[in-house]
Amino acid sequence: MSAPASLARARRRASAVRFWRAYRTHRAGLLGLAALTVIALVALAAPLLVGDDVQSVTRASGGPLEPPSAAFPLGTDQFGRDLLGLLVWGARISLLVGLLAAALSVAIGTLVGVIAGHYGGWFATALMRVTDWFLVMPTLVLAIVLATVMSRGVWTVVVAIGVTSWPTTARLVRAQTIAVESRPYIERARALGGGHGHIMNRHVLPNVMPLVLAQTTLGISAAILTEATLAFLGLGDPTVVSWGGMLQDAREAGAVSSGHWWYLAPPGLAIAAVALAFTLCGRAVESVLNPKLGAR
């Protein structure tokens, strides 16, 4: 390995160590990280913990809408399926959609923001006007429209959320890009013959990535809430179990009017808990990467 590569690797390792040391000082962030770790492990181990049969209607072992008991700690749904098992399986889809949708949203926003901030001129103005249009339009409404006109499925939900929630990231990244472009070493890079691609990849992107990381963490929380809303409205994938889909099934089963609280509470609390955990992590990351926020 060459000396420059070794030096760059050592710097990245030292930066990661400094980040973790600063992150550990945020108790709320640690609490959110611990909660997300447990939920992610449970979701990954769903086949081992509850098995595949829990999703089957024909092989349900309980009676319809049984209250919590020793056999069914969270009760059963209208088909007699164990709600605890469904909750565990639902975590997989809710987390997957949240992660993928947030990644797509941040990728689009970062691309638009870096290009607009670097090039400027009429092209940047046009990009920002498109961004402003998306900003003034309610994200949920646009996502509902896309999910309605496209075929129903997990990837449809991911795309519907990702392509409608990127404008905030684009605005933030553009502002950061303009700030980076004003620094002296950018002028030196241009004087030495650095092209647009070199400057954006070697100088701009590394400096905006901390902001992108914080925005991604916060975006996952919003994406999970949007996915739950779409599933609750019947626009999710009917072939998989998700927390939002469980809420929709509870509504269709009349759990609200009949007082079957155990059908509504688990998925609702799970959505709130995961959204809160990602928000706590995002705020902690934001505070570490931008110490001025922590002083407020």
Task: Name these PLM-found stretches.
Residues M1-T110, V114-I115, W122-T125, L140, ...:
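Gly/Trp-centered helix-boundary motif
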Residues L31-A35, V97-A101, L127-V130, A143, ...:
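Hydrophobic core positions of alpha-helical segments in small-molecule transporters
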Residues A46-V54, G117-G121, L146-R152, T226, ...:
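Short helix-capping/hinge motifs at transmembrane helix termini and TM-loop junctions
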Residues P73-D77, L83, L104-G109, V114-V180, ...:
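Generic hydrophobic transmembrane alpha-helix motif, especially the helices
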Residues R92-I108, G197-T229, F278:
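Transmembrane alpha-helices
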Residues L135, L146-V149, Q176-T177, G219, ...:
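Glycine-rich helix-loop "coupling/hinge" segments at transmembrane-helix boundaries
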Residues W166, A170, A223, V274-F278:
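Alpha-helical transmembrane segments
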